[in-house]
């Protein structure tokens, strides 16, 4: 399973290199209960990897599950949990995730003070 760990590490490093504010901007869309931090040394959690793939335009649950080597149910459960914790003013979460990292589209007025 070292290859999978290496894949995750490379994905996380590359993605955060492209979108360094991703974790903060993602957390700004959620209430305090759902806010998450990356793991040590810049590793993303499974939830953050799911939404990183959505940010990259991959929204199909089965495709996300295949890429992350987890079950469709796991992806569905994480997405459902996050959807329940979207701040009311955010609106369509996945549409907002698509805007993360695009200059001028980050709405810092919705940032969660718990971040």
Task: Kindly label every feature range from the protein language model.
Residues 5, 9-115:
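Cytosolic nucleotide-binding catalytic cores of signal-transduction proteins
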Residues 1-2:
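Short, charged/polar, low-complexity loop and linker segments
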């Amino acid at each position: 399973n070292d290859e999978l760990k290496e894949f995750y590490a490379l994905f996380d490093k590359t993605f955060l290199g492209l979108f360094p504010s991703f974790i903060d901007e993602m957390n700004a869309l959620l209430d305090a209960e759902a806010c998450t931090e990356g793991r040590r040394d810049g590793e993303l959690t499974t939830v953050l990897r799911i939404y990183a793939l959505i940010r990259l335009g991959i929204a199909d649950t089965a495709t996300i599950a295949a890429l992350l080597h987890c079950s469709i149910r796991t992806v569905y459960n994480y997405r459902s949990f996050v959807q329940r914790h979207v701040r009311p003013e955010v609106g369509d979460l996945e549409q907002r995730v698509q805007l993360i990292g695009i200059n001028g589209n980050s709405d810092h007025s919705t940032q969660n003070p718990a971040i």
